[in-house]
């Protein structure tokens, strides 16, 4: 549940960055389009968020505490970038 919480948080960050989420968008499309809004330095965080979300949602593998900590850290990185962008406007 924690991973899905952080994924929803990530989606809210994307909305703040101006990404018009569509109900038909899957995680691959969201990641691809988010790369147009975030700096290249954040691409690894975007990929990590998707990878951990897929593991939690579709995989037989258990989500570890490390996975939760990583997606939280990635969301923090993306949120900080979003905050910086908002301050510039």
What is the role of each PLM region?
Residues 1-89:
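Membrane-proximal, non-transmembrane interaction modules
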């Amino acid at each position: 549940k924690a991973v899905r919480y952080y994924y929803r948080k990530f989606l809210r960050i994307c909305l703040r960055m101006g990404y018009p989420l569509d109900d038909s968008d899957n995680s691959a499309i969201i990641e691809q389009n988010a790369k147009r809004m975030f700096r290249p330095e954040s691409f690894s965080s975007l990929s990590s968020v998707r990878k951990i979300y897929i593991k939690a949602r579709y995989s037989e593998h258990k989500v570890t505490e490390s996975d939760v900590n990583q997606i939280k850290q990635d969301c923090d990185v993306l949120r900080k970038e979003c905050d910086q962008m908002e301050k510039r406007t």
